[in-house]
Amino acid sequence: FGDELIERSREPLDHPWFAEGQPPVILAVGRLHHQKGFDVLLTAFSAVLAESPSRLIILGEGEERDRLERQARKLGIGASVQFPGFVKNPYAYMSRAALFILSSRWEGLPGALIEAMACGCPVVATDCPSGPAEIIENGTQGEIVPVEDYHALAAAMKRMLNTPRGRGVDRARSFSTASAVDAYLVMLERAP
């Protein structure tokens, strides 16, 4: 990430759920696919919503949209969940969300997690192969929970929902292009 991400995160967002006085918004971003674990997130969110007024927005498109929308209705949380699809500027959502969730079953390098941290959003992520455990120092910049454990995910979401913003910004900077270039140059300087 860089200055462009930060600038785009400050762009206006015309969404009524982010108006002052509204319940906190929990955000997830990704392809609507089994890999992303949004089915687990919906179940966890239903437990959060039972105790704390909140809303869930899942940005992205994919083949599981209909199934996920049906699941939300079946859980009785349909009015508190939105699937806006693909949006050109997810950073405006990330900078305003109360919490970002990465519920994946597996990942490569989860860019959306790093971007959410760069936007100052508190995060909860699953301990899926490749990524979150290497990015988040559990308890410091966010929380890590077991994959597919909606009880643990819900508990972490409840704990993190009112966490102050900005805890992961410095850690996210270590994944910026400038940091990668600096690390590469240091490695070249040390080479024989």
Residue ranges and their predicted role:
Residues 5-20, 25, 166:
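A short helix/loop element that forms part of the nucleotide-sugar donor recognition site in Leloir-type
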Residues 20-32, 38-83:
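A conserved nucleotide-sugar
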Residues 86, 105:
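Aromatic "clamp/platform" in nucleotide-sugar-dependent glycosyltransferases that forms part
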Residues 98, 120:
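A short alpha->beta transition loop at the rim of the catalytic pocket in nucleotide-sugar-dependent
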Residues 115, 128-139, 143-144:
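Short acidic/histidine- and often glycine-rich active-site loop of Leloir-type glycosyltransferases
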Residues 122-126:
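Short hydrophobic beta-strand element within catalytic cores of glycosyltransferases
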Residues 137-150, 158-163:
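Conserved acidic donor-binding segment of nucleotide-sugar-dependent glycosyltransferases
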Residues 165-191:
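A charged, aromatic-enriched C-terminal amphipathic alpha-helix characteristic of glycosyltransferases
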